[in-house]
Amino acid sequence: MSLFDHSVSELHTLLQKKEVSISDLVDESYRRIGEVEEKVQAFLTLNEEQARAKAKELDDQLAKGEETNPLFGLPIGIKDNIVTKGLRTTCAIKILYNFDPIYDATVMERLNAAGAITIGKLNMDEFAMGSSTENSGFQLTRNPWDLKRVPGGSSGGSAAAVAAGEVPFALGSDTGGSIRQPAAFCGVVGLKPTYGRVSRFGLVAFASSLDQIGPITRTVEDNAYLLQAIAGVDPMDSTSANVPVPNYVEALTGDIKGLKIAVPNEYLGEGVDEGVRQSVLAALAVLEKLGATWEEVSLPHSKYALATYYLLASSEASANLARFDGVRYGYRTDNAKNLIDMYKLTRSEGFGAEVKRRIMLGTFALSSGYYDAYYKKAQKVRTLIKRDFENVFERYDVIIGPTTPTPAFKIGEKTSDPLTMYANDILTIPVNLAGVPAISVPCGFVDGLPVGLQIIGKHFDESTVYRVAHAFEQATDYHKQKPVL
């Protein structure tokens, strides 16, 4: 039995009783990485020397009997688009291959203050643009459940590392499903918080009105502990919300009697794998037995979500990525004859194909002749999508459906057709456009591959999302299943 089969609260108890040391936990993480990393390839950069030094320092504090919190001394993996002072941050793209940040993201400051230990930085799609982690500029991460399949994306390294037992939990980011989709593919728990619940300061921006940092864990309770540590208003991020952060762990009562669930008919219709559909219906039956009721509803503008998202996200990416020019940091071409040449060649050599595709799409949507027809119209449709959610939430507590239309697909299966790749996020994207919280929890298997159940909540009501997810988790054992590597 691995130490990481224990929950956060169990590990905390073991540390308090001195049955294990923090150094033991760090050793276990690097031991497991040494055992499976060649197969999974989740990490881009390891932080071994600093992690072991911090473990020794925290062990000394523990020996003195100092008061500690639940995350104290626990190893964590960090998606490589969250800046870490003194630890290389690449966003999995060539143009930032040597970027060494001089400050920590706010979430890193909060994790460090809580005593968490950064094990390393995790692979992803370049600048978080992708649904399979195949767009990484450095390596291909594989799904621990089937090494011939993708782990999902863009937080594929984070989900794969947790599923493979390399770390007990990890941070990811979610712009259109990039936490929830890989969590579903890898059979772990992933939450996208409400937009503004977690500071984005220090998150390398893809689409600023959609991006949100969130936790990927083995269990719902662990997820709640991690969100508790990173949530809250931040003066360094003007979009972070000054909304009180409740005690998420206290919300895990297991009681969902009288809960009203909405199930959008758009989420179980055409394009959803039959095995996935049956897994979700079985999950709803479990929730019914626990005292909840569910009804079918409609989110009529969902069919426009994919087009709306790719216009808005690509437009924001076009603006955000203009700063990567080879002047101040990162890669700079050696082949330039003049300044303009340097800009062009640095970006063409430093960006991958998917990043270039989205910059082109965004620049086109923002151009003077097409701004009203594309970008402005997409913003109007986004408002309609948000209203759909608001209307449903007037009558129901949560919305439930599958996280993804299918289980994990094979490596290389969708790379030649970007539209089929984009369509894999069709059930997660509306949540980002509306800015509401959503979690993916394991709810079954299709041909030995995990299936995710998506539970969507009202703005800043992560507590109810967690309560429902935890009640379902405790009534099933899908979260206890582990891949064999």
Swiss-Prot record:
One of its GO terms (biological process) is translation. Keywords: ATP-binding, Ligase, Nucleotide-binding, Protein biosynthesis. One of its GO terms (molecular function) is ATP binding. It catalyses: L-glutamyl-tRNA(Gln) + L-glutamine + ATP + H2O = L-glutaminyl-tRNA(Gln) + L-glutamate + ADP + phosphate + H(+). The active site is at residues 79, 154, 178. Its EC number is 6.3.5.7. The keyword Ligase applies. One of its GO terms (cellular component) is glutamyl-tRNA(Gln) amidotransferase complex. InterPro entries: Amidase, Amidase_CS, Amidase_dom, AS_sf, GatA. Allows the formation of correctly charged Gln-tRNA(Gln) through the transamidation of misacylated Glu-tRNA(Gln) in organisms which lack glutaminyl-tRNA synthetase. The reaction takes place in the presence of glutamine and ATP through an activated gamma-phospho-Glu-tRNA(Gln). Belongs to the amidase family. GatA subfamily. Heterotrimer of A, B and C subunits. This is Glutamyl-tRNA(Gln) amidotransferase subunit A. It comes from Geobacillus stearothermophilus.
